């Protein structure tokens, strides 16, 4: 299962969260099955988002869509966004 990990700094978490919740990328329509928003404990102005997809094609298309969004008005609520596509190798609840 491919996961897109996005990470970036935010000048204001609250303003960024409002933009994220407005869902300009249409997460469900883009194939996102599940996502998590993470914050760094010692740097609350840095966020990471993990988005799970069924296939690599959807993940790659989503990253392209996000690059377009990042080059638009999203610049006001985030700094230096970066996306990577990773594969889950192992996961287990203990």
PLM segments and residue spans:
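Short structural boundary motif marking the start of a folded domain
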Residues: 1-4
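Short hydrophobic/aromatic beta-strand micro-patches
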Residues: 7-9, 50-52
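Short, surface-exposed ligand-recognition loops at beta-strand->loop->(often short) alpha-helix junctions
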Residues: 9-19
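An amphipathic, aromatic/His-enriched active-site/gating alpha helix that lines ligand/cofactor pockets
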Residues: 17-36, 52-85
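A short beta-turn/loop motif at secondary-structure boundaries
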Residues: 38-43
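Surface-exposed aromatic
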Residues: 44-48
